[in-house]
């Protein structure tokens, strides 16, 4: 190996006869992917490329997140706990990636952004179909959001499908009911288009699980997986809001919203409220929760 020349030779087995064969760029369709960054500013503002790539990569991660959450729902429907936990673990890491990449956009200063903001017109991240779709999968359902996508019948139909189907949390509650937990009957069939709100009738179910983790370890582990997902999602929302505040202050959003104020409202929205509420009541009657199971059970 000619290390003294600061290079490495191609190994004999490396494929170089690639004419007409599947290549890295062909498999990933890089010609299409890397030609999709088309700044609208004239002359092209240097920082518009950052803005475009930030949002395009976010949409790719959102596509993967939606893919994993749909799989989690199917696994719950089939009572496949460990498979569900696997995809929820991946979902959490995707959300972490989405959260951390705000640090790249934070390098965009207010003066730099104002150099090309006008070309965005009324376009806004608020119009991200995939983001709304994921919110619906997780249970933050709002039929009003369909109005935003009236210009896109296909996308609107996809969003409506998620609106009218049980969310991840609702499928989790149905899973608990199948395994003997006292889930109210209306969770078997209700108006799935309505957002889930905190329900005191569910608290005893989760108190029982959290105070008897040795007996209900699978249910308990799923609860904590869902808490992880919501926590990371809220961190993403918070980081989004702070990044917007850093870049535009309290200006109105390009999509017509109040901007930071509207994003702050999202931080009050929850997916799995009972899983957080139960933490207040666990063990308050003086009975210590049961410990975790031994290794054979886990």
UniProtKB/Swiss-Prot annotation:
Pfam families the record matches: Trp_dioxygenase
Enzyme Commission (EC) number: 1.13.11.11
Binding of substrate, residues: 51-55, 113, 117, 254
UniProt cross-references to SUPFAM superfamilies, sorted A to Z: Indolic compounds 2,3-dioxygenase-like
Domain of life: Bacteria
Note accompanying the cofactor annotation: Binds 1 heme group per subunit.
Pathway connected to this protein: Amino-acid degradation; L-tryptophan degradation via kynurenine pathway; L-kynurenine from L-tryptophan: step 1/2
Any GO BP: L-tryptophan catabolic process to kynurenine
Obligatory cofactor(s): heme
Binding site for heme: 240
Record function comment: Heme-dependent dioxygenase that catalyzes the oxidative cleavage of the L-tryptophan (L-Trp) pyrrole ring and converts L-tryptophan to N-formyl-L-kynurenine. Catalyzes the oxidative cleavage of the indole moiety.
Family: Belongs to the tryptophan 2,3-dioxygenase family.
Protein name per UniProt: Tryptophan 2,3-dioxygenase
Protein source organism: Xanthomonas euvesicatoria pv. vesicatoria (strain 85-10)
């Amino acid at each position: 190996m000619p290390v003294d020349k600061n290079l490495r030779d191609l190994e004999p087995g490396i494929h170089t006869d690639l004419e007409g064969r599947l290549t890295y760029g062909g498999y990933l369709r890089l010609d299409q992917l890397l030609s999709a960054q088309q700044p609208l500013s004239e002359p092209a503002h240097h920082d518009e490329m950052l803005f475009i790539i930030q949002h395009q990569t976010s949409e790719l991660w959102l596509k993967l997140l939606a893919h994993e959450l749909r799989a989690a729902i199917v696994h719950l429907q089939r009572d496949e706990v460990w498979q569900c936990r696997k995809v929820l673990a991946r979902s959490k890491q995707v959300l972490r990636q989405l959260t951390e990449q705000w640090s790249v956009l934070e390098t965009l200063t207010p003066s730099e952004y104002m150099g090309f903001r006008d070309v965005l017109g009324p376009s806004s991240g608020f119009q991200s179909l995939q983001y709304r779709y994921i919110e619906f999968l997780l249970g933050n359902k709002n039929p009003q959001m369909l109005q935003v996508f009236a210009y896109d019948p296909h996308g609107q139909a996809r969003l409506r499908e998620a609106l009218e189907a049980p969310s991840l949390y609702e499928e989790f509650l149905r899973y608990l009911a199948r395994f003997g937990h006292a889930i109210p009957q209306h969770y078997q069939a209700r108006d799935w288009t309505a957002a889930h709100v905190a329900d005191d009738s569910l608290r005893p179910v989760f108190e029982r699980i959290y105070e008897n983790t040795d007996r209900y370890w699978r249910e308990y582990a799923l609860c904590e997986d869902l808490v992880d997902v919501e926590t990371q999602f809220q961190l993403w929302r918070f980081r989004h809001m702070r990044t917007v505040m850093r870049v535009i202050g309290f200006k109105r959003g390009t999509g017509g919203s109040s901007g930071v104020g509207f994003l702050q409202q999202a931080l009050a929205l929850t997916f799995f409220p009972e899983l957080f509420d139960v933490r207040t009541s666990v063990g308050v009657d003086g009975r210590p929760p049961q410990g975790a199971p031994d290794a054979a059970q886990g």
